[in-house]
Amino acid sequence: MKNKKLHIWIALVVIAFFVCLAIFGCGDSIKGIRDMRFGIDIRGGVEAVFEPAGLKTKPTKEQLEMARDVIETRLDAQNILDREVTVDEKAGDIIVRFPWKSDEKDFDPETAIQELGEMAELTFRGEDNTVYVKGSDVSKSQVAVDQQNRYVVELEFTSKGAKKFADATEKLVGQTMRIYMDEELISNPTVNAKITGGKAEITGMASQEEAQNLSDKINSGALPFSMETTNYNTISPTLGNKALNAMALAAEIALVLTCLFMIAWYRLPGVISCLTLAFQVALQVLVISVPQYTITLPGIAGLILSAGMAVDANIIISERISEELKKGNSVRTAVKNGYKRAFSSVLDGNVTTAVVAGILMVLGSGTMLSFGYTLLTGVIINLLAGVWMSRYMLNSVIRYKLFNQEKWFRKKKEKKILKFTETKKYFFLTSVVLLMAGLIWSSVNGMKLDTQFTGGVILRYTYSGEADTGKIQKEVQDVVDRNVNVQTAKNSATGEKNLVITLSGKKGLTPEQQKEILNTINEGNTNQFETAETSAIEPYIGAKALKNSAIAIVLSFLFIVVYIRVRFSALGGLASGVTAVIALLHDILIVLFIFGIFKIPVNDAFVAVTLTIIGYSINDTIVLYDRIREHRNGAKNKSTLAELVDISTTETLQRSINTAFTVVLCAFVIFVVSVVYGMESITNFSLPLLAGLISGCYSSICIAGPLWVWWEEHKERIQKRKTGRKGK
């Protein structure tokens, strides 16, 4: 027993070790927070979906893998080593993500995308267009300078290639040998004699850069087919760095405020909760940084929110300990029983949230995949490490006489049982009024799907001085032959000016068109426009994203109904599952109407918010159901269903409010910081999330329980009628 006093010191050493490891890392194998791999929305970069061009049939797996290898080699040649190249075998696409070369001011992301998709097949042809030698016959290519001090590309052929080249030059003596890159003629020298030795050179290079690009293409090899993209996103590193600084600030503020609240309210258990939270955050950082998982802005938001939700487990435990102390138990007994009786609620809540996050990972992509990953790892770490560590430390601390006193704990006071079920009609009416108001307001404003789901193009540029939107609109329309909307915006916090160009229709945009637009609006303007962000998406990509989003939400609902039916069979199973889902639908509609009221286009942020609210709200409802089940299974319990719900809701009310406060606090900090820093994407994510969290707390307290009572009482009345008929 005395040895347990040492556990707190062991735990503190372990926590300090992992916190230091998370901050500083250890060598090349364990990277810390400073070496985390950030997504293109943070550090700037390019994301493009390449699809085969001109193929009559779907490319095979082997062809796609071959194309990926070529793209990887081309990225190597450009020294872009930190990238992701993913094959979507089902869709027949290749998805490429790589960072913006922030150290190169002249880096052109559109040109980079265009070059990646070029087939780049080198061919040596005769005057009749007969192909004699191909790029695959070349073993090596390099840039050199000839005797006239001109840049050339030297070629070395394979053994088979050398023979083919010798045979071709022998046949074409006195004629020109035309050298093509794809269908572009790059050189047409006259063959004077048969060339042996397996070497040749390509002349006519205008510069070293042109020669190097040609050499890189030859060395990389040709794609098995040409690829094109009208689906891509780019973001400048300047915009990304501002977003990273803002989210880091939000994380610091949210964690500090959460810890201050926990210590002020729960005292000693609150201190233990903060230490546990530091341990969990350190583990989560390592889970992201060690495997170099790409973290995006929504991923950081998920990290902050998972930290806020992790506090929930400690709140449940602390509230249980307070109840045990109120019963007259000793501190040690209260702590022991508190953890024991809180475990089922913690387990059920974490399982449902983990499954929802897993669904988002499976069906989501890009930034939302990152959000799902951080949320899922946060939940798993909370369940496996967080709860255990807090119990380990608290059980050790109370072995010291100084802390084995009730003054270090918050003791619950007797509370009057609140009659939630008697006022259920008012709760239901309030919800109906809110939902109807939201429906009407959203209908007036009009719900709008983002280009992410519908397809389309949005171009964002930064500039200084003044911008003639009318002139720019006409210039861009002449380039793309589509209706164009041009708007200007100014970030009140930074003073940065933005030009936003939206192209009508649901077509994407080629990199060549994007370059032409930028050149056109810069031509003749004293104010130079610089690309900040581009988004070009084809309708079929958007339709796929919308379909996956709908599937994710439906699967989440189905899982919740099945899980609650199994876990809470004592509460009618199906009744508890269906009423929980109705409460969730209430919250989702609130979120949807927030999108409509504030004219926020519905995109994957809506999906992430919805799934987060599902995980949070169902967790709240499960805590209530768990308490109802506990009372209903009591041997001496003779309370009515309404009394059971009123007692259980009153007992869990403080926990619900405190959990809502900590999570809403985190979301509110994210919202405020995003508004101050002008991060529209995060604002459009955090505002609906904030509303959904508040709605989730309300629905779990005022809707789920009373609705379950109404269902069960209605079922009993039907059963009595049937029994009465049989008696007659």
Per-range role (PLM):
Residues M1-K728:
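A structural signal for conserved, well-ordered secondary-structure elements
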